[in-house]
Amino acid sequence: MRSLLFVVGAWVAAAVTHLTPNAALATGTTPTVGANSTADPGTGANGTTVPAAGTPANSTTAAETPAPFPPVDFALPVVIGGLCALTLAAMGAGALLHRCCRRAAARRRQRAAYVYA
């Protein structure tokens, strides 16, 4: 039973450690400029205005749409979950096989005791 808890705990830990950094990126927070930054992107070297980066007003390209939430890759948690399922299935099959073998051995001992008695 301890191995079952270990397998489930490992899956949960892997899912949490894999999803936590991606969830922080999915919030849409942008990095802030350092406090000692003095560059002003709005003016050029000679005082003229520099156009802002991005698409021009007459461009036909659409604005970028946000990705659906959660925009994370579930490959690692799915693989680990699949391994957990296989492990649990193997544990169940092993327990069933062990039970059947014990019953068969008990029947053999019973027959041997009856024959040689």
Swiss-Prot record:
Residues 27-40 have a biased composition (Polar residues). Glycans are attached at residues 36, 46, 58. Keywords: Glycoprotein, Host endoplasmic reticulum, Host endosome, Host Golgi apparatus, Host membrane, Membrane, Signal, Transmembrane, Transmembrane helix. It is a single-pass type I membrane protein. The chain crosses the membrane at residues 74-94. One of its GO terms (cellular component) is host cell endosome membrane. Residues 1-26 form the signal peptide. Residues 26-64 are annotated as: Disordered. Residues 95-117 are cytoplasmic. Pfam families: Alpha_GJ (PF03229). InterPro entries: Herpes_gJ (IPR004913). It is found in: Host Golgi apparatus membrane; Host endoplasmic reticulum membrane; Host endosome membrane. Residues 27-73 are extracellular. Its main location: host cell. Belongs to the alphaherpesvirinae glycoprotein J family. Inhibits host cell apoptosis. Induces an increase in reactive oxygen species (ROS) in the host cell. This is Envelope glycoprotein J. It comes from Cercopithecine herpesvirus 1. The gene is gJ.
